[in-house]
């Protein structure tokens, strides 16, 4: 279990439930298939394993892992629009009258209900790691919407969830721009070969660089004309590489082979043991990586009133 993306949230108070109570709470909103007339469903599933006995909360030392699954019926908008248009034209031709918005909307609703049972189904899962002692929730997603879906549903089942996105004192854009300009990153961080540069004007240009020497004159010229770094590929120690963006989202997270080999050795021959070992090692690595990242970005900013 290696996360590929990271959205970082700060618990502003202690988590109001322990692992056992959390297990009970998640069981009140289990993931389930869409009924024939449902567009979407959302609920919790076991992060590891299948079957009724698989726990909804995986506990490893001081860390908890949960997973939510969304199931949705896919109705292409173009298909619905074409069907509505065809039905409206049929009514107007047969009844010699104009179909207005209210009736058109009703026709659309009827067509959606008729198409729903035949629609394709898409499933997607979102994992979140909870580190109560560190006061963090880490969501394995680069989409704030998907993270908020999980967090709001978690809040619903436990009654309260005092959490906010972790913020830093120095804007990531300012720090990343300085690192590329000076060709020197914070201790243990290394600039790699990919970045995105944006003009500070609203309608300014965007330059995306991949497999390029970011110390080159071309890059420095873009920076000297006012562009700033909004995404930057980085490595930390010899343990992981990632892409950092201007909103402090960690994307394309990749753990180096040394860590993965260690997890394989620690996990034994069973699949569950391998998953547990990789999750534990990942969280221990985050325990060093995240404080270093926050410090490199000027330290954590606590909003007023919190």
UniProtKB/Swiss-Prot annotation:
Subcellular location(s) per record: Cytoplasm, Nucleoid
Biological processes annotated in GO: DNA recombination; regulation of DNA recombination
One MF annotation (Gene Ontology) recorded for this entry: double-stranded DNA binding
Subcellular location, principal: cytoplasm
Alphabetical UniProt keywords: Cytoplasm, DNA recombination
UniProt cross-references to InterPro entries, sorted A to Z: RdgC (IPR007476)
Entry's Gene Ontology cellular component terms: bacterial nucleoid; cytoplasm
Keyword Cytoplasm: yes
Signal sequence, start to end: none
Free-text function comment from the UniProt entry: May be involved in recombination.
Family designation: Belongs to the RdgC family.
NCBIfam families associated with the record: PRK00321.1-2, PRK00321.1-3, PRK00321.1-5
HAMAP family, per the entry: RdgC
Record protein name field: Recombination-associated protein RdgC
């Amino acid at each position: 279990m290696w996360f590929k993306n990271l959205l970082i949230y700060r618990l502003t108070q202690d988590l109001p439930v322990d692992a056992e109570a959390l297990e009970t709470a998640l069981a009140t909103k289990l993931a389930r298939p869409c009924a024939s007339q449902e567009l979407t469903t959302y609920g919790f599933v076991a992060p590891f394993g299948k079957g009724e006995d698989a726990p909804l909360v995986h506990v490893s030392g001081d860390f908890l892992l949960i997973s939510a699954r969304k199931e949705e019926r896919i109705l292409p908008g173009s298909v619905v629009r074409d069907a509505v248009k065809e039905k409206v034209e049929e009514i107007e031709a047969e009844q010699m009258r104009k179909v207005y918005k209210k009736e058109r909307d009703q026709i659309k609703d009827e067509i959606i209900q008729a198409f729903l049972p035949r629609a394709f189904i898409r499933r997607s899962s979102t994992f979140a790691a909870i580190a109560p002692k560190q006061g963090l929730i880490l969501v394995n997603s680069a989409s704030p919407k998907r993270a908020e879906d999980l967090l709001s549903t978690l809040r619903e089942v436990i009654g309260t969830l005092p959490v906010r996105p972790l913020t830093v004192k120095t804007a990531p854009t300012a720090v990343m721009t300085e690192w590329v300009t000076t060709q020197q990153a914070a201790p243990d961080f290394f600039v790699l070969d990919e970045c995105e540069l944006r003009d500070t004007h609203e309608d300014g240009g965007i330059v995306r660089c991949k497999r390029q020497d970011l110390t080159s004159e071309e890059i420095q010229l873009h920076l000297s004309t006012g562009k700033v770094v909004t995404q930057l590929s980085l490595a930390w120690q010899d343990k992981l590489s990632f892409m950092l963006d201007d909103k402090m989202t960690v994307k394309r997270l990749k753990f180096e082979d040394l860590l993965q080999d260690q997890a394989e050795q620690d996990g034994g021959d069973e699949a569950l043991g391998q998953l547990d070992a990789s999750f534990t090692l990942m969280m221990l690595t985050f325990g060093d990586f995240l404080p270093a990242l926050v410090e490199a970005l000027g330290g954590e900013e606590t909003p007023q009133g919190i």
